[in-house]
């Protein structure tokens, strides 16, 4: 079934020879794509001659749907083998690990992931997403197999930490190719809704991770925590193959026009003349490292990720040890947080596009205020309160926090040229994971152990306030960029209407003369 669905490249290549007389042989160029020293099989594919308009209109929608499903399945799969330490935190604690030990192990993955997401993005922007994403998933799966193998006997914190670091490096190969595919196949004006829909991969993957781990512990024994790593990894190998068959890197490599041309929707930040002559590093430095708006966005991501991981990573342990729940109830809280994020993410994307007209920062601020209220509900009830109270608070927190998580990644794509969009998103991700996730794992673990959970919750609320301030700073520049993009789009459409009117007038005059 897969082969019959995904062999369009071979079919289309065969039809090209028969349609030589009608095919526009103008090459569909990928403007200013960086040069690459990657192995030939991993490089971004070269553009092919443009296909006839009838063929373009038939193929474009189908491939857009196909690649979207591909990056959805692919990125959700990474989550099946990412945050599994948190899911077995209570079991690890019963086996002698302290909160600080667990925090360090979890932080090794998050820290490595943050750096990898940035540096992998600089490679991914020159690589074929069809190969790059499945490759990272397979390598991450193999690392989780090694974690399961090394689990026999006494738990070694150092070995565990090293393997989680390696896992984090390969995990960083997931988001950048997905972001690259998103900017090449979906235009700016539609990207809010599409990005929101794709972003629920965080929640789908996270929730399925909890379900797979719960099944593994139930089937292979509640003390067999190694199964929480190797069992989901086996599933990921299959999903990596499916991802490979679905994903296509960019429209031009399929003989299609760019999405900006196809939808008449220019990018907010276009490739300029300097981008075409300077090195990739010079472009990154100019558009990202020396761009105050991008720096504000990166620091906002620090505090958003502190809240995201500070809540969900410690939920299984907090619910078991403080709220008196079982291990399964703690894992249920983790999954509730993730599942609720689906609704919140979709709602956030809709509000961002329809209510605030693309002003992502304002939408993020509104959602972060809601996160503060959810954290208070999670913290303030007495320890003997029913478990549904804590689950409700986690549902609200998950539904609200994933909106800003999605928006910041989307803003990084919107506020940078397409050929370094993945790197821009990787830059904000680097800050989110290297700093935010560190504070969420090691930081909150140390605060809770030495100062109590009350101090940890106060810390989370402070982080939420700081994220609101930084998003306010980003909003000022965002308004300016959006105004320029709308003016340009309106000018192009006005010109097209004038040309169409002139053509109609010319045709009418010709008919009168005849």
Predicted regions mapped to residue ranges:
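C-terminal transmembrane helical hairpin of 12-TM major facilitator-type secondary transporters
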Residues: 358-408
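Extracytoplasmic gate region of multi-pass secondary transporters
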Residues: 85-87, 290-346, 405, 437-441
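Cytoplasmic helix-loop-helix junction between adjacent transmembrane helices
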Residues: 163-201
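Cytoplasmic membrane-interface "Motif A"-like loop-to-helix N-cap segments
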Residues: 126-137, 354-368
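Glycine-rich segments within core transmembrane alpha-helices of 12-TM secondary carriers
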Residues: 192-213, 217, 341, 429-440
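Helix-loop-helix hairpin linking two adjacent transmembrane segments in secondary transporters
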Residues: 198-252
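Juxtamembrane intracellular "pre-TM" segments in multi-pass secondary transporters
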Residues: 48-61, 254-296, 492
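C-terminal ends and interior cores of transmembrane alpha-helices
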Residues: 138-154, 369-383
């Amino acid at each position: 079934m897969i082969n019959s669905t995904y062999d369009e490249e071979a079919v289309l290549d065969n039809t090209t020879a028969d349609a030589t007389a009608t095919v526009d042989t103008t090459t569909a160029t990928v403007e200013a794509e960086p040069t690459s020293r990657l192995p030939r099989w991993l490089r971004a594919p070269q553009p092919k001659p443009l296909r006839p308009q009838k063929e373009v209109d038939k193929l474009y929608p189908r491939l857009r749907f196909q690649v979207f499903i591909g990056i959805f399945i692919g990125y959700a799969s990474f989550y099946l083998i990412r945050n599994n330490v948190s899911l077995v935190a209570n079991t690890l604690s019963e086996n002698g690990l302290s909160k600080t030990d667990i925090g360090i192990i979890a932080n090794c993955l998050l820290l490595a992931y943050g750096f990898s997401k940035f540096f992998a993005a600089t490679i991914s922007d020159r690589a074929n997403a069809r190969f790059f994403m499945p490759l990272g998933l397979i390598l991450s799966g193999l690392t989780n197999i090694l974690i399961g193998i090394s689990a026999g006997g006494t738990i070694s914190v150092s070995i565990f930490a090293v393997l989680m670091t390696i896992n984090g490096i390969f995990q960083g190969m997931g988001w950048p190719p997905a972001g690259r595919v998103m900017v090449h196949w979906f235009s700016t004006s539609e990207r809010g809704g599409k990005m929101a829909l794709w972003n629920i991969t965080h929640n789908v993957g996270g929730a399925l991770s909890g379900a797979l781990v719960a099944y593994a512990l139930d089937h292979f024994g509640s003390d067999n925590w190694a199964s929480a790593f190797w069992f989901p990894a086996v599933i990921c190998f299959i999903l990596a193959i499916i991802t490979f068959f679905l994903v296509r890197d960019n429209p031009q490599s399929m003989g299609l026009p760019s999405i900006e041309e196809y939808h008449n929707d220019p990018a907010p930040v276009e490739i300029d003349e300097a981008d075409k002559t300077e090195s990739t590093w010079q472009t990154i430095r100019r558009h990202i490292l020396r761009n105050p708006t991008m720096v504000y966005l990166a620091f906002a991501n620090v505090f958003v990720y502190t809240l995201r991981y500070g809540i969900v990573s410690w939920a299984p342990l907090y619910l078991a040890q403080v709220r008196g729940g079982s291990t399964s109830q703690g894992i249920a809280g983790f999954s509730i947080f993730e599942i609720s994020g689906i609704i919140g993410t979709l709602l956030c994307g809709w509000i961002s596009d329809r209510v605030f007209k693309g002003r992502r920062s304002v939408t993020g601020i509104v959602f972060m205020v809601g996160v503060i209220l959810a954290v208070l509900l999670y913290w303030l009830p007495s320890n003997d309160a029913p478990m549904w109270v804590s689950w409700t608070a986690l549902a609200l927190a998950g539904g609200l926090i994933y909106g800003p998580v999605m928006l910041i990644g989307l803003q990084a794509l919107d506020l940078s040229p397409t050929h370094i969009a993945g790197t821009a998103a990787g830059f904000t991700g680097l800050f989110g994971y290297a700093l935010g996730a560190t504070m969420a794992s090691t930081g909150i673990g140390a605060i809770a152990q030495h100062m109590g959970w009350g101090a940890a919750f106060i810390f989370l609320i402070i982080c939420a306030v700081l994220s609101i301030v930084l998003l306010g700073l980003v909003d000022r520049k965002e308004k300016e960029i959006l105004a320029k993009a709308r003016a340009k789009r309106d000018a192009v459409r006005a010109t097209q209407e004038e040309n169409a009117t002139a053509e109609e007038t010319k045709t009418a005059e010709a008919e009168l003369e005849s």
